[in-house]
Amino acid sequence: MAAQIINGFELAKEKRAQLAKEVEQLKREGIEPALAVILVGDHPASQSYVKAKQKACEEIGIRSILLTFPNDISESFLLEQIARLNKDRSIHGILVQLPLPSQINELHVIEAIAPEKDVDGFHPLNVGRMMIGQRAFLPCTPYGILYMVQSLQVDIIGKHVVVVGRSHIVGKPVGQLFLREHATVTYCHSRTNDLEAITRQADILIVAVGKPKLITSSYVKEGAIVIDVGVNRLENGKLCGDVDFDDVKQVASYITPVPKGVGPMTITMLLHNTVQAAREQHK
């Protein structure tokens, strides 16, 4: 029996409708949630991502401010702009679109954002708080993945979650979020021995490595939930994930497609964090 599709597009639509109501309520209280987005250079993918984020903000009533700078700006100049936004009480969230040019240290930039405005959830203080279970802004893609799995109404407690990939943005934090939900978590990466033997043990398999169709049905246990975070463009121009969708859907119980899987939830959780930031800063 083929897997049921986890439609991230529809889930995102439902969550955004809820967020739009929260924004309306905040505005009635005299609070207009606002997100500042910084874009450095003219990288086409970055421009596309920023456009999508701004459109999503507009749809639910969040004010978004775009600051664009040329590729050759200095790190000190960028840090000055962030410092200014940190002090601006009308701005509740700050997002710097990555990657940045080579002359700018990304960690310096992330650390410069005030933790209470770090709606990407990348600041070391937010990461640390997440690790020990304190209230924090959670990184958007991992948070979106957890939301998707929870939407299935499955009991996560005691489930074996296998995460393929160990990036700071997805792999590491998503494992921590499931650990907080009392799952048993295993991390796999490029140096893992016998990857297939480990992934076949997963009740929930999360793949985020950027290798087209790496995971086939032989890597997946019958009835597993499969979350595909990868977005890869094939030579024919089509998008595909890290999971061979047509093959794996024959054995999984639930699976996310690419596109319209995890992607829409990432932006939705950015909106969620921005609304939360506005509420927290006006307590």
Swiss-Prot record:
SUPFAM superfamilies reported for this sequence: Aminoacid dehydrogenase-like, N-terminal domain, NAD(P)-binding Rossmann-fold domains
Similarity remark: Belongs to the tetrahydrofolate dehydrogenase/cyclohydrolase family.
Gene Ontology molecular function, alphabetical: methenyltetrahydrofolate cyclohydrolase activity; methylenetetrahydrofolate dehydrogenase (NADP+) activity
Annotated source species: Anoxybacillus flavithermus (strain DSM 21510 / WK1)
Record's function text: Catalyzes the oxidation of 5,10-methylenetetrahydrofolate to 5,10-methenyltetrahydrofolate and then the hydrolysis of 5,10-methenyltetrahydrofolate to 10-formyltetrahydrofolate.
Classification via HAMAP family: THF_DHG_CYH
Pfam families cross-referenced by the UniProt entry: THF_DHG_CYH (PF00763), THF_DHG_CYH_C (PF02882)
Protein name (Swiss-Prot/TrEMBL): Bifunctional protein FolD
UniProt GO BP: L-histidine biosynthetic process; methionine biosynthetic process; purine nucleotide biosynthetic process; tetrahydrofolate interconversion
Sequence intervals crossing the membrane: none
Protein's UniProt keywords contain Amino-acid biosynthesis: yes
Binding site for NADP(+): G165, R166, S167, S190, V231
Keywords per UniProt: Amino-acid biosynthesis, Histidine biosynthesis, Hydrolase, Methionine biosynthesis, Multifunctional enzyme, NADP, One-carbon metabolism, Oxidoreductase, Purine biosynthesis
Matches recorded under PANTHER family: C-1-TETRAHYDROFOLATE SYNTHASE, CYTOPLASMIC, C-1-TETRAHYDROFOLATE SYNTHASE, CYTOPLASMIC-RELATED
GO cellular component: cytosol
EC number(s) stated in the UniProt entry for this protein: 1.5.1.5, 3.5.4.9
Cross-referenced InterPro entries: Aminoacid_DH-like_N_sf, NAD(P)-bd_dom_sf, THF_DH/CycHdrlase, THF_DH/CycHdrlase_cat_dom, THF_DH/CycHdrlase_CS, THF_DH/CycHdrlase_NAD-bd_dom
Pathway: One-carbon metabolism; tetrahydrofolate interconversion
Oligomer and partners: Homodimer.
